[in-house]
Amino acid sequence: MACGEVVVEGRSVPRVANPRDTESALNWQLERIGSAAWLDWPLKFQRMAFGYANDSGWHDAADAVSWLDHHKLLREGQAPRGALVWYHAGDRIRVACSLGSGQVVGPLLTGPVEVALLISLSTDYVWSDPHFPFGH
C-alpha cells in the first residue's frame, strides 16, 4: 500500500484533503459554542465541521473507532490541534476535536457545544487525524 492511501474493503482508496482545513473546521465549531442543536450528534457535528454535508458511512462513533482501529489510524498520547479525539463517556464512545493543550470542542455530554478539558471528560481516549474516508 502506498503512503497516503487507505484500504477500504480490499481496495485502495487515495486519501483526499477535507473540504475544510483544520483552522476553518475549528472556527466553524467555535462559532457554535452554546448550541444545543447537536445533542447526541457528535460524529455528525465533526463531519460537518470538516466540510462533509453527507453521511460519514459510520453508524456512530463506536463504529468509526472500530474502522479506524482496524486500519491502524488511531494514536495514543496528547492529541494535536485539529485531531479527532475519541473518548469513553459513560457507556458509549464520543468524539470531539482537539484545540491543543488538552482542550477539546464539540457537543459534549451535557448537550451543548462546549470547550472542555479532555481530562474532565475521560481518561480513556485515543485520537486520529480528521479523516472521513466515506464522507462526501
Where are these regions (language model features)?
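Structural recognition of the beta-strand scaffold that forms the well-ordered cores
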Residues: 82-87, 95-98, 104-106
